[in-house]
Structure formats: structure tokens, C-alpha cells
Amino acid sequence: MPRTQRNDNFIDKTFTVVADILLKVLPTSQREKQAFSYYRNGMSAQAEGEYAEALQNYYEAMRLEVDAYDRSYILYNIGLIHTSNGEHGRALEYYYQALERNPSLSSALNNIAVIYHYRGEQAIENGQSEISQILFEKAADYWKEAIRLAPTNYIEALNWLKMTGRLTGLAT
């Protein structure tokens, strides 16, 4: 059974119906429609925690999708899966690729910052205070850019920047 027919969630069903209508109505190529269909199936599988299936759909969408902006969201979602699986290095690679195609993707900037912050915390636990400071500075840089792009989305990050004295260079 196709993934789109397995959704039990009202919002997922609504999204699927609207997406199907848009695919039929909008003047897009068959390739673009296929890419979107794989992307949509990937999102659905990801929401259900079916990461292997989601990745298969995202990779297929990447093979078909030519638009850089659309590819950025596919790459971002692949990064999310790797983050969920604890594969932070791989996640960073995908977030960076997403940002190359869409520098305004604040959620990718935020997720990169979260990973650097997490690594900074790990460095502290391992007694590597100098390394932790470098990692925290990287996190701060990415959070500042995310906040610049989406000022109301990252309140916790903004508070962390204020509390740690790293708010310089950001108009608030």
C-alpha cells in the first residue's frame, strides 16, 4: 500500500489531499511531480519513525529534484534523520549542503548550533575546556545567524547567548 494511503492522522490526510490536488493542477513536469511524491512519502515515513524508508524516499527525491531550493529541504530532512540516529557528523554534512542551496534555512542553522553546543557539553564532561569554548563559539555563531533570520523562533538560544555573554554582533 502506498505510504500516502496509510496515514491515520487528520493533518497528514489533509496535507496528502491538498498535495495531490496541487500536483494535478500546477503546471509541473512529471519528474517534478515524482520528486515531490517521493519527498512527501519520505516526510510521512519520517513522521512515523520509519527512517530507513524515509531515507530511501529522500534519496530518490534527490535523484529527481533539480531545484536547489527544493533540494535544500530534502537534504535538511536527511540531516534530521541522521541527528535522530545520533550520527551528528553525517547530519552536519547534510545541513551544510542544505545551507549551500538555501542560506536562509534557519532551522538548519539552529540544528548545526545544537550539535556544536552538544559537542561543547561533551567536551566539558571530558575535561576539555578549551575545546568546549571553541565549540560553544561555533554554536553561538550559527544561533546568531538563525536568530537574525527568524528572530522569534529561537528564544532558548537567544537566552543562552545572553547568559553566556555571546550576544555580541546581534541586534535584539
Curated annotation (Swiss-Prot):
InterPro entries for this protein: PSI_Ycf3_assembly, TPR-like_helical_dom_sf, TPR_rpt
Keywords attached to this entry: Chloroplast, Membrane, Photosynthesis, Plastid, Repeat, Thylakoid, TPR repeat
SUPFAM superfamilies associated with the record: TPR-like
GO biological process: photosystem I assembly
Protein topology in the membrane: Peripheral membrane protein
Keyword Phosphoprotein: no
Start and stop residues of the TPR repeats: 35-68, 72-105, 120-153
Domain of life: Eukaryota
Gene Ontology CC terms: chloroplast thylakoid membrane; thylakoid
Location(s), subcellular: Plastid, Chloroplast thylakoid membrane
Family: Belongs to the Ycf3 family.
Role of this protein: Essential for the assembly of the photosystem I (PSI) complex. May act as a chaperone-like factor to guide the assembly of the PSI subunits.
Protein name, as recorded: Photosystem I assembly protein Ycf3
